[in-house]
């Protein structure tokens, strides 16, 4: 039970960090990705996202937009999902 709480606590912290990046564009991209997919993440996927949050927003956005190659440590299904950009909801 405490392990589940730990994972939920990590997800809460990750959500805050995903939505408070410093620019609105990064908030929508990274926060929107978190909101769309976090509910089904395994512990390994959550760890991947936590590591991604440590990277500079400019780099993360460049990887998501495919304007720079994604480093090997972030390659895989999650970055491919992020590159689809179908989760970005821009309020009008």
List each language-model region with its residue ranges.
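Positively charged, polar, low-complexity stretches
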Residues: 2-92
